[in-house]
């Protein structure tokens, strides 16, 4: 059985060896040789030589070599299905390999925030690397958040952090980040203060932040809530403002700054709306114009929004005060303390830390109660102004209804008068026809007819008016 092989060299010419029971032997020149043996092999060799156009002189003896001319190089590379790979397929495979290397390199660049990212990628193994390549090939990008990081010493920096790095550094779970994810602001508009083992998630309107033991990450820092929070937090972290007293834990400073900034924003909004509503309440009873009514509508809408936000914040603070477990979890954050699952008591390895945590628990309760009172005051004032605006709307509606009633009465009286006059016009029309009544020959007939029409119309009007008054229609 004969087979064909080729040498994997890149020269312009290659030797093709036909193997007949013996392995091929290279000859001195650039061609190939054929070894044959025996009579059967010799006959077979003669046939091959004749077909290739060689003379018998080039053949050896019984075991001689048959010289073959140089042939073009054949590709020895084979595909997975056993067929030879063409040049185009080899170029496509090389391009695919280069593209795959580029994708894996891009994935490594994204996943490498430092040495931690390299160690994490090495720990995941080859399977995770395959997942990363598929992650990019599908066009799916891991969410990357642009946040401001404020440390406990007051240093502030802007950074980009992926969701995986965020979960790893804060010890949170994926479902925990939904309350602070800026892309889900329509689904998590309710204010919340979630306490976890290593972080506190703050969601107060446009303010979204994650407070940890030594730093805080602020999302949407360009929003009004984020700017107000930074203006309230940074002065607290200045060592000159401590006045030598004991400093509060950093996470408590963050919580208080967040609540303070939110309450102050609500108070400023109330202070802008209250004078405007008061001025409208004084003007409206005597001046019912379209502009004044439109201002009343806008003010009422602003009061409804303010009352809703203050009410949601008040309910969040009430729920937090009703759950002492959450307050204790805030106190033990960053300390070697745990909470007993049965009695919910704090257990600390150092007695001093337990004493400090208990004192902080009382401070947190007083802090929350203080902001709860301010929030209730805002909510109550907004509700009172809203009630006044609604009462004014009811008064305006009654006033307009009374005016419409007066217009309807006048219109009815005019219709009655018109009816009575129409009867007189009917009589005049009858006499105005070209019929001979023989009254036109008498001078007194005109005055008698005119007086009768006027008296009849007036009498008919008073009769209809008394009837409508009796039926309480007028």
Curated annotation (Swiss-Prot):
SUPFAM superfamilies listed in its UniProt record: Magnesium transport protein CorA, transmembrane region (SSF144083)
One of the record's GO cellular component terms: chloroplast membrane
Protein name per its UniProtKB record: Magnesium transporter MRS2-A, chloroplastic
Extent of Basic and acidic residues compositional bias: 104-122
Gene: MRS2-A
UniProt-recorded Gene Ontology molecular function terms: magnesium ion transmembrane transporter activity
Function per UniProt: Magnesium transporter that may mediate the influx of magnesium in chloroplast.
Any single biological process term in GO: magnesium ion homeostasis
Subcellular location: Plastid; Plastid, Chloroplast membrane
Location of region: Disordered: 79-129
Annotated keywords: Chloroplast, Ion transport, Magnesium, Membrane, Plastid, Transit peptide, Transmembrane, Transmembrane helix, Transport
Keyword flag Chloroplast: yes
Membrane topology: Multi-pass membrane protein
Organism per entry: Oryza sativa subsp. japonica (Rice)
Residue stretches spanning the membrane: 412-432, 444-464
Biased composition (Acidic residues): 88-103
Transit pept. (range): 1-55
Family membership: Belongs to the CorA metal ion transporter (MIT) (TC 1.A.35.5) family.
Superkingdom field: Eukaryota
Motif (Required for magnesium transport activity): 432-434
Pfam family membership, one: MRS2-like
């Amino acid at each position: 059985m004969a087979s064909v092989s080729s040498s994997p060299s890149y020269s312009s010419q290659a030797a093709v060896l036909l193997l007949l029971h013996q392995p091929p032997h290279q000859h001195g020149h650039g061609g190939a040789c054929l070894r044959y043996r025996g009579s059967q092999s010799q006959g077979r060799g003669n046939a091959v030589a004749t077909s290739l156009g060689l003379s018998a002189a080039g053949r050896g003896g019984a075991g001689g070599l048959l010289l073959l001319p140089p042939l073009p190089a054949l590709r020895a590379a084979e595909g997975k299905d056993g067929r030879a790979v063409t040049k185009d397929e080899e170029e496509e495979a090389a391009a695919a390999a280069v593209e795959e290397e580029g994708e894996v390199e891009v994935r490594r660049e994204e996943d490498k925030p430092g040495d931690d990212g390299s160690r994490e990628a090495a720990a995941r193994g080859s399977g995770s690397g395959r997942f990363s390549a598929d992650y990019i090939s599908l066009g799916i990008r891991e969410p990357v958040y642009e946040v401001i990081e404020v440390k406990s010493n007051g240093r502030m920096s802007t950074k980009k952090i992926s969701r995986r790095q965020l979960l790893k550094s804060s010890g949170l779970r994926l479902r925990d980040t939904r309350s602070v994810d800026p892309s889900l602001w329509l689904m998590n508009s309710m204010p919340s203060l979630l306490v976890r083992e290593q972080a506190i998630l703050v969601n107060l309107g446009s303010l979204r932040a994650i407070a940890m033991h030594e730093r805080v990450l602020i999302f949407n820092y360009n929003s009004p809530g984020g700017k107000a929070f930074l203006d309230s937090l940074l002065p607290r972290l200045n060592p000159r403002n401590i006045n030598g007293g004991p400093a509060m834990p950093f996470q408590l400073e963050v919580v208080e700054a967040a609540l303070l900034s939110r309450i102050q924003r609500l108070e400023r909004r109330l202070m802008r709306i209250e004078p405007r509503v008061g001025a409208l309440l004084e003007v409206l009873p005597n001046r019912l114009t379209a502009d004044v009514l439109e201002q009343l509508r806008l003010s009422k809408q602003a009061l409804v929004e303010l009352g809703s936000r203050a009410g949601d914040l008040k309910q969040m603070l009430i729920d937090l005060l009703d759950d002492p477990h959450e307050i204790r979890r805030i106190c033990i954050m960053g300390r070697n303390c745990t909470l007993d699952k049965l009695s919910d008591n704090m257990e600390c390895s150092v007695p001093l830390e337990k004493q400090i945590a208990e004192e902080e628990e009382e401070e947190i309760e007083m802090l929350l109660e203080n902001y709860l009172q301010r929030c209730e005051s805002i909510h109550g004032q907004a509700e009172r102004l809203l009630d006044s605006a609604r009462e004014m709307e009811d008064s305006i509606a009654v006033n307009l209804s009374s005016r419409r009633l007066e217009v309807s009465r006048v219109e009815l009286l005019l219709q009655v008068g018109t009816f009575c006059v129409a009867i007189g016009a009917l009589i005049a029309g009858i006499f105005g026809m070209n019929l001979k009544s023989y009254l036109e020959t008498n001078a007194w007939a005109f005055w008698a007819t005119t007086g009768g029409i006027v008296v009849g119309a007036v009498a008919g009007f008073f009769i209809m008016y008394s009837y409508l008054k009796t039926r309480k229609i007028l």
